[in-house]
Structures are given as structure tokens and as C-alpha cells.
Amino acid sequence: MTQLKNPVLMATIGAAQGLRGEVRVKSFTDDPTALGDYGNLHSEDGRVFEVLEIREAKNVVVVRFRGVNDRTAAEALNGLELFIERDNLPDDDLDEDEFFYADLEGMEAVDRTGKSYGSVTGVFDFGAGDLLELKGPGLRPVLIPFTEWSVLEIDLEAGKLVIDPTAAGLVDDEKSGPGKPFPTKRK
């Protein structure tokens, strides 16, 4: 199999489930049970996985893939990431202001003056809302909230996000002056 040109991470395989080759899968799709609707899934090493059965379980889905017929084969897949080609995502179903998180990666984050704050290297959800990871040349990665206050505009065609650096926590409010560290306790 050839490598995917524009891979999108769809799921990560977890532990084996039962004896018939089923695995627990963390799906990154809006509807976890729709994982098989995007066509065959691919691993980074070139293997192809076809979803035969899928059902919901606690916080994951349980999946049976073609050719994975016993627990030993299922256990060998633990930790494997599964991808599809970006072109397999259904753009026709999106509203004008909707997009896929995969489309944000690589976009440059700029403020209204055009100053760059780096490029989006990841989109994360740790439970309290989505975060964008930004990384600029020679800079440490930073996380900013993916909210309408922090991200003012998304221009997919230009490959840019317009952000409010103050709302994103990248700079202090100009009125308050330079940031001060937390006071230390006196003994």
C-alpha cells in the first residue's frame, strides 16, 4: 500500500475485547460509530483495516476488523493509530462556518496587524474545551483556547487564523502593563 498523501487521524486502537478479535477503539469522529463510514482505515506502516462490526461501549467503541480473528491478533494492534485520506472526509455536509480540525493544522495564527504567533500544530480537547497548539520558529509550543474570543476569524483558503493575542493569553492587556509574577510567601 502507498502512504497517504494527506492523512487524518481518525482513531487509536486500545486493548483487546473478548476472544473473537475485537478491540476497543478511541474514535475521534463526531459520531464514534461512524468510524467505518469513511472507507478503509490505514496504519502508518501501510496496513489497511476494514471495519466489519462496530458498537458503542464506555467512552470507546468496540470494533471487529477484517482479518483480526482472535485475541492474540487483537492484542498486537494495541496503540496503533488509524488514518484516512483527507479527501475521504465529506466536505459537502459542512455548513459555511464549519470545518474539520485536520484543516486547521499548519495554518498560521496572526493578529489583526498581521503579526504571526506561529502555526497550528495540533487541536486538543482535554475536557474543558478545545485548545489549539501554536508553535513558532525557535519558540516553545503554547496552547490557546479555541473560542470565538480568542480565534476571531478562520480563513481556510488563505491558511490563516486571526487571533486576539490578549484573549488567547499570549500577551497581557496593554492597559494593565507588564505581567507580574505571583507574590511569594514571606516566612
Curated annotation (Swiss-Prot):
Alphabetically ordered keywords of this record: Chaperone, Cytoplasm, Ribosome biogenesis, rRNA processing
Subcellular location(s) per record: Cytoplasm
GO biological process, one term: ribosomal small subunit biogenesis
GO molecular function (one): ribosome binding
Taxonomic superkingdom: Bacteria
Principal subcellular localization: cytoplasm
Gene Ontology cellular component list: cytoplasm; ribosome
One Pfam family from the record: RimM
Family: Belongs to the RimM family.
Domain observations: The PRC barrel domain binds ribosomal protein uS19.
Record text on subunit structure and interactions: Binds ribosomal protein uS19.
Role noted for this protein: An accessory protein needed during the final step in the assembly of 30S ribosomal subunit, possibly for assembly of the head region. Essential for efficient processing of 16S rRNA. May be needed both before and after RbfA during the maturation of 16S rRNA. It has affinity for free ribosomal 30S subunits but not for 70S ribosomes.
Name of the protein: Ribosome maturation factor RimM
Organism: Sinorhizobium medicae (strain WSM419)
